[in-house]
From Swiss-Prot:
The protein's name in its UniProt record: Mdm2-binding protein
Subunit structure: Interacts with MDM2.
Lineage: Eukaryota, Metazoa, Chordata, Craniata, Vertebrata
Effect of loss of the gene: Death between E3.5 and E7.5. Mice containing a heterozygous deletion of this gene coupled with heterozygous deletion of TP53 exhibit an increased incidence of metastatic tumors.
Keyword field contains Cell wall biogenesis/degradation: no
Annotated family: Belongs to the MTBP family.
Source organism of this protein record: Mus musculus
Bias type Basic and acidic residues, positions: 802-822
Segments for region (Disordered): 563-587, 701-822
Record's keyword terms, sorted: Cell cycle, Growth arrest, Phosphoprotein, Ubl conjugation pathway
Function: May play a role in MDM2-dependent p53/TP53 homeostasis in unstressed cells. Inhibits autoubiquitination of MDM2, thereby enhancing MDM2 stability. This promotes MDM2-mediated ubiquitination of p53/TP53 and its subsequent degradation. Inhibits cell migration in vitro and suppresses the invasive behavior of tumor cells.
């Protein structure tokens, strides 16, 4: 990660110019180390101090993050510097981040600082010539506003997250430090860098713990003495962030902030290191940009004996807490990790995004967004999510304790990084070993010899003896087939056994596979003596004898499979919609029962039909499985009585039907409800001759039937019936869906056919059954003369019969849509007749068809049939003239 240093100084009084000769080169360090007098803290002096301190601390052999992908190697780390200084009533700020060149004696930054200091000095001298009262009357708030705006402009030029580490050094005035309210704008700009850019703030001063206590608390800054501020920047820091531990099952997460990784100088370099730097002269790899994650994620605890030695690298780092850390939980975690010594380690991963191009600064972290966010006055400051595009990779680190709150982080090679490098390192190790054998060293190095236990030696000798017996039998067999004497001489037998032993030790592993795998983790000095007397690495013998365990085979995966695995890791904590409804799918997915051909044929007849009824698969969803009733089939379920069927459990059966035709009752009730809801707002016809009791009317009143545009359509009614029946099937368990709120309709006409909806209280289903007309009973109860009552009764009954017959015959002959078509044709005919286009006219057929189509096109958008007849007339009258002219013109052309 690149390092960005920001120097912020708040000083009073007069600047001492470096160009004036008051400070000689090299004396600024002694002036700071002395405590007798106030040191001369100009921006140039501080820059020289930091540059010299960083240059002395940087070691070229310190460990850095290597390449984590095949795209290329990361760019070398760079250092940048910027300054924002306030002196009296004047301030200046760097316009951009300037790169620090440690190999140059003087760089561009010094020229910029010198020019700014001279400008500031001239401004201060001008102020001294003016009156002191006018100088004090200058608005100090505007000065801090201007300084804050300059800092915001610098923050907008920072790279994307994960690319830079920012260190801010604040040097306030010791005599009269500003209060928090006065310098709030510039402190807010520093807060922006602290929260959204993960900057580290250091306040240096003699009495800053007292004078700048509130500022330090607001910025979570560490306070150091003035003499130690140059040591506050640690050049060995490669990464700063937090440690995250997640609980995948419940989605819990805990963070430990203020951790850092530091590079260390390697003490020894192994010959079997997977680094292929010796090819760097021939192959020039491309440069890429690394964007590191903000957190070191915990993976698992690991036993060192279970970790293959080929995955270990020689690159090591130090994990520590940042300087002046005050987080107790972070200190406690560091103590726990530092106690991991010996056989156990903690495995962590540092995410990294690799990009071929430099990603521009994101707009989500801009100063404008910060001002808008702080204007809302949030209780807690949250960092916006920024998506860095590129190749997703990471570094696996094995953490082990070093004591005294220090941890060693060893870099592990991933499967993609070890591809091919393992075999290459083995070959390289062989070459070095053979070259070293030419010049033997004394005394003899016994550590290079292999170490075996007693059981392993005995097992090897037993295998060798059996192998020699087989070789001897084969030799006798061949001599007999060649008609040679079977007798062996002593020299021939000795040479045969020696050759057999040599071939056995040269081409076969003397250890079993399990023991060989265990030895690779525990035995450090491994080698096998071959026929040439040279020492072979133990890993090469492992690679020859057990190819299935080669590390290269772990990376021979399909790209699509790896992408699916990454997608599952990203979305593994989020439940799917089907799992939210049905529960998590428990049990292995690949647990399929495979049948032989004979076993499969047992379940089918000679015709290819199944032997028995098909049974549903037992699929467990959730914690409570759906237990099926044993020996139950659809045929058996149909003949069971209701009491027994309701206690059974069968796949797909949500409810059972009783013996009282509940489905027909539901259909009748839905038909009744659909009619009531459809025609509940229509008016009724009343007569004052005699009252009729109020009933639920499933049919429309005669007044509704008399209107041609309000005749109920039979097809639509049947469609609603089917819809309601299917809806009741789905909602049969919800009693509130079966009993919607009913509306009462008064039917006081003697011409209507009354009916009554009956409700059975013993069952959960309602039905409406048509009954005989009750008008006779209602009328007979009135105090009327007997003759008139009988006449009225006979008239009423005959009128009801005629109305019922005419209505039923009309519904059987003509549907609603057919009636609307007939009505529209009659309206079109009458309209054309008024315009002197009768049936005898030659253009009557064309005009009527054209006017019918146009009128039908305009009438199809109507949402209700009320007033349909008037709309037909209006539409036909509006379009009849245009239709006649169009038809006449068309016929004249013919």
């Amino acid at each position: 990660m690149d390092r960005y240093l920001l120097l912020v100084t708040w000083r009073e009084g007069k600047f001492r110019s470096v160009a004036g000769g008051e400070i000689e080169p090299g004396t600024e360090a002694t002036s700071l180390e002395s405590t007798d007098k106030q040191p001369d803290l100009t921006a140039t002096n501080i820059y020289h101090l930091l540059k010299r301190s960083i240059s002395d601390s940087i070691h070229p052999d310190d460990s850095t993050f290597p390449a984590c992908s095949v795209g290329g190697t990361p760019h070398s780390r760079k250092w940048f510097f910027a300054v924002q200084a306030i002196c009296g009533f004047y301030q200046f700020c760097s316009s951009d981040w300037q790169e620090i060149h440690f190999d140059a004696e003087k760089d561009k930054i010094e020229d910029v600082l010198q020019a700014n200091i001279e400008e500031c000095q001239s401004a201060v001298e001008c102020f001294e010539e003016d009156d002191s009262n006018s100088r004090e009357s200058l608005p100090l708030a505007d000065l801090y506003e201007e300084s804050a705006e300059n800092l915001h402009q610098l923050s907008d030029k920072l790279p994307a997250p994960g690319r830079a580490m920012i260190d801010i050094i604040l040097l306030p005035s010791d005599k009269d430090p500003p209060k928090l309210k006065e310098c709030l704008p510039i402190v807010g700009a520093l807060k922006h860098l602290k929260e959204w850019h993960s900057a580290k703030v250091i306040i240096a001063g003699s009495y800053c713990e007292i004078n700048c206590q509130k500022i330090a608390e607001y910025l979570s800054a560490s306070v150091v003495p003035l003499e130690e501020f140059r040591n506050a920047i640690d050049p060995r820091e490669l990464w700063r962030g937090e440690i995250q531990m997640r609980e995948r099952k419940f989605g819990f997460e805990i963070s430990f902030p203020e951790f850092c990784l530091k590079g260390v100088t390697p003490t020894n370099v192994s010959a079997y290191n997977l680094n292929t730097c010796f090819l760097a002269k021939k192959i020039a790899s491309s440069k890429v940009f690394h964007y590191y994650g903000p957190a070191l994620e915990f993976v698992q605890m690991i036993k060192l004996s279970d970790l293959p030695s080929c995955y270990m690298s020689d690159i090591e780092f130090e994990l520590e807490v940042t300087g002046h850390c005050t987080r107790q939980n972070s200190m406690l975690l560091l103590e726990q990790i530092s106690s991991l010594c010996g056989k156990v380690g903690a495995l962590f991963v540092l995410p990294c995004t690799v990009s071929n191009v430099l990603i521009p600064p994101p707009s989500q972290l801009a100063s404008r967004k910060w001002k808008e966010y702080m204007a809302k006055k949030p209780k807690t400051i949250s960092v916006p999510d920024v998506a860095v595009k590129g190749e997703f990779s990471g570094y696996h680190l094995l953490l082990q304790g070093m004591g005294k709150r220090k941890c060693r982080a060893t870099l592990l090679h991933s499967a993609s990084q070890i591809n091919g490098s393992f075999a290459l390192s083995v070959i390289h190790g062989k070459m070095k070993t053979k070259a070293g054998e030419a010049r033997p060293s004394f005394p003899f190095d016994f550590s290079s010899l292999p170490r075996f236990s007693e059981e392993q030696v005995l097992q090897r000798e037993k295998q060798l003896a059996s192998f020699q017996v087989l070789a001897l039998k084969e030799c006798l067999k061949r001599r007999k087939a060649a008609n040679q004497p079977e007798a062996f001489s002593a020299d021939e037998l000795k040479s045969l056994l020696a050759l057999t032993r040599e071939r056995f030790l040269g081409h076969f592993d003397v250890l079993p596979t399990e023991a060989a795998l265990a030895q690779t983790d525990t035995v450090k000095a491994a080698g096998v003596v071959n026929d040439d007397g040279t020492v072979e690495p133990y890993s090469s013998s492992l690679m020859e004898t057990n190819p299935l365990e080669w590390p290269e085979r772990h990376v021979l995966q399909n790209l699509e499979t790896s992408e699916k695995a990454k997608q599952k890791m990203r979305t593994g904590s989020l439940p799917r919609s089907s799992e939210q409804l049905l529960g998590h799918k428990e049990g292995p997915r690949d647990s399929l029962t495979l049948l032989d051909a004979k076993e499969l044929l047992k379940y089918f007849t000679s015709d290819g039909l199944p032997v028995g009824d098909l049974q549903p698969l037992h699929i467990q969803r959730g914690e409570k499985p759906f237990v099926l009733t044993p020996e139950l089939s659809p045929g058996k379920l149909q003949v069971l009585p209701f009491e027994k069927a309701s206690e059974c459990h069968y796949h797909g059966i949500e409810y059972c039907l009783d013996d009282q035709k509940a489905l027909e009752r539901d259909g009748g009730f839905s038909e009744l409800q659909s009619r009531l809801i459809r025609y509940e707002t229509q008016t009724t016809c009343t007569r004052d001759s005699f009252p009729v009791p109020t009933v639920l009317s499933p049919l429309p009143s005669p007044a509704v039937l008399s209107e041609p545009q309000s005749v109920p359509e039979g097809e639509a009614l049947q469609g609603e019936l089917r819809t309601e029946v299917s809806g009741l099937k789905r909602r049969s368990k919800d009693p509130s869906c079966l009993y919607p709120q009913k509306r009462l309709t008064r039917s006081e006409s003697s011409d209507c056919l009354p009916s009554q909806a009956s409700c059975n209280s013993n069952h959960h289903h309602h039905t409406g059954k048509p009954r005989k007309p009750q008008a006779e009973r209602c009328v007979s109860g009135l105090p009327l003369p007997g003759r008139e009552a009988s006449k009225d009764t006979s008239k009423t009954s005959s009128g009801q019969k005629r109305a019922h017959e005419s209505k039923s015959s009309k519904q059987m002959k003509e549907s609603r849509s057919q009636k609307h078509t007939r009505m529209l044709k009659e309206v079109v005919k009458d309209t054309l007749k008024r315009h002197h286009i009768t049936e005898a006219h030659e253009s009557f057929t064309a005009c009527s068809q054209r006017l019918f189509d146009i009128s039908k096109f305009y009438l199809k958008d109507l949402k209700t049939s009320r007033g349909l007849f008037e709309e037909m007339k209006k539409t036909a009258n509006n379009n009849v003239v245009q239709v006649i002219e169009w038809v006449v013109e068309k016929m004249s052309k013919k």
